[in-house]
């Protein structure tokens, strides 16, 4: 597990970043890689997004960001933040290239042992390239005291890894459910994961 020197951790600039993965879609429910395909939320996904509203209502956010893809934007709107959200291209999901729409078992039929984290998708982004986008999101978020960002599964996992100075591919160690909340903050001055994959509002 590779770590960067403490002085260069992306989260060192301060602030708190709350990440919300979009609600369920038909593709996410079936395990299909959903990158640039602009798929809508399922009925369950919309219900889960609405449950986020009450959970997040009591917290003040200086800034709200969202991916341009509708599954994240609609989650943001149903959670009550659509009127103030900034659309940020870097919050879009990993570009899976030719592996878009396929499940991991389908991909492994031709490439045994494949993971998006190590080998990457055919004709899509590498983990390092997604990591560069994650760093830009972190740099934007840490300009404010507390930022709320609506994004996607793999992208948010990369942001979590980069916040604490790990390589983007170490996001493989951070599982993330749909409509889950994550909080990235600090232990004194050190960037830390305060909360991860919180779905208690869906119970």
What are these regions (language model features)?
Residues 109-129:
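Short glycine/proline- and acidic residue-enriched helix-loop micro-motifs
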Residues 1-15, 94-105, 143, 161-203:
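Acidic, low-complexity terminal tails and accessory targeting/binding regions
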Residues 2-11, 50-115:
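Phosphate-coordination/substrate-recognition cap region in phosphate-metabolizing enzymes
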Residues 78, 158, 162:
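Active-site signature of alpha/beta-hydrolase-fold catalytic machinery across serine-
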Residues 153-157, 187:
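GST superfamily/GST-like fold recognition
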Residues 15-75, 122-135:
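Loop-to-helix element that buttresses phosphate recognition and phosphoryl-transfer chemistry
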Residues 17, 144-154:
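Generic beta-sheet signal
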Residues 57-60, 141-145:
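Glycine-rich phosphate-binding loop signature in dinucleotide/nucleotide-binding domains
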């Amino acid at each position: 597990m590779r770590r960067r020197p403490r002085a260069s951790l992306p989260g060192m600039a301060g602030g708190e970043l709350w990440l919300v993965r979009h609600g369920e879609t038909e593709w996410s429910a079936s395990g299909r890689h959903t990158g640039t395909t602009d798929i809508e939320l399922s009925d369950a996904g919309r219900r889960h997004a609405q449950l986020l509203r009450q959970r997040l209502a009591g917290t003040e956010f200086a800034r709200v960001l969202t991916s341009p893809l509708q599954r994240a934007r609609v989650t943001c709107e149903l959670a009550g933040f659509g009127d103030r959200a900034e659309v940020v291209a870097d919050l879009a999901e990993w570009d899976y290239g030719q592996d878009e729409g396929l499940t991991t078992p389908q991909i492994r039929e031709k490439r045994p042992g494949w993971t998006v984290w190590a080998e990457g998708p055919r004709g899509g982004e590498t983990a390092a390239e997604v990591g560069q986008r994650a760093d830009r999101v972190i740099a934007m978020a840490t300009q404010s005291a507390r930022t709320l960002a609506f994004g996607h599964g793999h992208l948010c996992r990369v942001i979590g890894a980069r916040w604490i100075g790990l390589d983007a591919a170490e996001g493989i160690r951070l599982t993330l459910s749909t409509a889950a909340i994550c909080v990235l903050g600090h232990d004194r001055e050190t960037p830390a994961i305060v909360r991860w994959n919180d779905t208690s509002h869906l119970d």
